[in-house]
Amino acid sequence: MTMGRIFYIIKADKEIIRTESGGENAMDRYLKETEMLDYSSKNIRQLIAKRKWDRLDAFRRVQAIYNFVRDEILFGYNTDDSIPASKVLADGYGQCNTKGTLFMALLRACRIPCRVHGFTIDKALQKGAMTGFVYKNAPQNVFHSWVEVYLDDRWYELEAYILDKAYLTRLQQQNSGCTGAFCGYGVAVQDLQHPVIDFDRNNTYIQSEGINQDFGIYDAPDDLLKAHHQEMSPLKTFLYRHLGRHLMNRNVKKIRRQK
């Protein structure tokens, strides 16, 4: 696979965001609750109350929620991309699309505007996390997304919440000889040992070098999935849900536990 990132500069529009005062909000559509972004769910409200994220300033709020989704919701494969945020939280694990759904729900519950950007990535990026017949039978183009967050009058592209630090650290240790580009095990970056994964008013990426198709920006994952989704036959979908993802999750756990 020749890695090549499709790069887009997305300029923030001139719409005024007033999330703290409770006044009119010109981008209310980026704060709406949806079927997938079900932030009124009991477990989501309890989590926010426990963590007290809504008491933080906007930057610290985004940073704290980002770190929670990245490191406390472990990298793993759920039953389907369309599950709601409350289910992702209950599962305690997720991948790009499902962790993104939870991230967006938590942000919107805390009055941080956000949207979703859809793509596909080459399946070579998943090699290692996927193995054997699971990898062989996986679609060549894997459905992918990241979350874009509006803060300080600009949009930030955030993707590196996908892999928890414990998993990524093990990959870095197991591939300590790699000092440049790396593609596999859920990673596609220019520099494996120094990827930009921490949010400090910057974009973060962990799979962007594997992008091979851009579907554009949508208000919510519900809208994205109405237009695009993972293309698999009914049989392959059944096998993924009931066998493939369990093998993948077992493999990911094995990597995370290795010393």
Regions found by a protein language model. Name each.
Residues 6-10, 14-17:
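Short, positively charged and aromatic/hydrophobic N-terminal segments
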Residues 78-138, 142:
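Active-site neighborhood of thiol-dependent amide/isopeptide-bond enzymes
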Residues 5, 63, 255-258:
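Long, composition-driven mixed-charge/polar low-complexity segments
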